[in-house]
């Protein structure tokens, strides 16, 4: 049965209205459909090179190539955000993609199930001399702060060598995580996404499944809003990429090792062992070894 012009027009109008409402109430659903992970990049491929190549499939709104925070070298992968989700389909329909003489590996971005974008960051290597006002001033430049936690040593009643900063939304966290180290006051601090204690325990259980001694040291770090500085050094493990400024994108099924993504950075599991001593005989900086 053929629809009349009036019926067809009404149907199109109704569907457009419903789609618009769905977009307004589920913005992340449409954002993730337009985002891609690009692996296997040449060390020489620049952001401009990648943008120009992918622009043939549609308008590119944003493009990022991740670099080593210490050496500044490309880590061989990046992310791209298209204006329209159909551009992602076009990229995937093409069997091979070659850029700068190397086959690249584009994949559709996948949001982690049940994982909210991080709004809280862990700040390690914080000098005890850095004032709360300096911390507020620096981090306030990235967005609206909801809360700052400055843990105290219960024995000495002095500030610990780390803190937590919570924002009202996730955008400031993503901006902060674009750089691993930040100059705050007189010292260089390390910024990492904070994870709730239950997330940390779930990750630990996965890693220690079938092994012994999985509960050892679990009491460490409790009392700081139930957050741990867990596994922040590992870039090749399950959910790690969601904590590096990409708001919870899941690439756990991807063999990152082929691209050298596991940089072997220090694992700060148990904040007391790394940032724990506030002054400790004046040797605070020696307790912080990120390199």
Swiss-Prot record:
Region (Disordered): 196-226
Gene3D superfamilies found in the cross-reference section: 3.30.70.330
Classification via InterPro entries: hnRPDL_RRM1, Nucleotide-bd_a/b_plait_sf, RBD_domain_sf, RRM_dom
Major subcellular site: nucleus
Record keyword Repeat present: yes
GO cellular component, one term: cytoplasm
Pfam families: RRM_1
Compartment list: Nucleus; Cytoplasm
An individual GO BP term: regulation of gene expression
RRM domain sequence ranges: 34-116, 119-196
Keywords from the named record: Cytoplasm, DNA-binding, Methylation, Nucleus, Repeat, RNA-binding, Transcription, Transcription regulation
SMART domains in UniProt: RRM
Residue spans of biased composition, Gly residues class: 210-222
GO molecular function, one term: poly(G) binding
Superkingdom of this protein's organism: Eukaryota
UniProt cross-references to PANTHER family, sorted A to Z: HETEROGENEOUS NUCLEAR RIBONUCLEOPROTEIN D-LIKE, RNA-BINDING (RRM/RBD/RNP MOTIFS) FAMILY PROTEIN
Purpose of the protein: Acts as a transcriptional regulator. Binds DNA and RNA.
Name of the protein: Heterogeneous nuclear ribonucleoprotein D-like-B
Lineage: Eukaryota, Metazoa, Chordata, Craniata, Vertebrata
